[in-house]
Regions:
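Short, charged/polar low-complexity linear motifs in solvent-exposed/disordered segments
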Residues: 48-49, 97
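N-terminal start-of-chain detector that recognizes signal peptides
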Residues: 30-33, 50-54
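Short Lys/Arg-enriched helix C-cap and helix-to-coil transition segments
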Residues: 51-65
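Key DNA-contact positions within bacterial/archaeal DNA-binding proteins
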Residues: 37-41
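DNA major-groove recognition helix of helix-turn-helix
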Residues: 43, 47
Length: 124
């Protein structure tokens, strides 16, 4: 599986690869400079509150035919970033909001909310 990993430098520069973002819990915790238990807790809360669907945001990846691990999508990484309070998560949130604001050179952001009981979610 070709997967991209987000990096955040010490001075807050965010780099998102061109490959689809799929990151392990350890990679997410390294990017946001938190302990792995904080990432696990955030993921559990996001799934428990049905903010995101596990089927859409998590994949099982097998490496070298033996080691299996879970990876999470960009959507999950963004959701986690909004639950943390670190310098890196703030830099990432600012990066995401700047990208949303700069779409088509406009400063307006339109958010559409689905009020469905089965899969509540937000789309931009």
């Amino acid at each position: 599986m070709d997967r991209g990993i987000i990096t955040i430098s010490k001075n807050g520069v965010v780099t998102i690869p061109t490959a689809p973002v799929w990151m392990t819990q350890q990679e997410i915790s390294d990017a946001f400079n938190v302990f792995g238990c904080d990432i696990r807790r955030a993921i559990h809360a996001i799934y428990k509150n049905m903010e995101l669907s596990e089927e859409e945001t998590m994949r099982h990846v097998r490496q070298n035919g033996r080691i299996c691990y879970d990876v999470y999508s960009l959507e999950m990484v963004v959701a986690i970033a909004f639950r943390l309070r670190t310098k890196e998560s703030v830099a990432f949130r600012r990066f995401i909001m700047d990208k949303l604001r700069s779409v088509n050179g406009k400063n307006s952001v339109y958010l559409f909310f689905s009020l469905s009981d089965t899969h509540p979610r937000c789309t931009c």
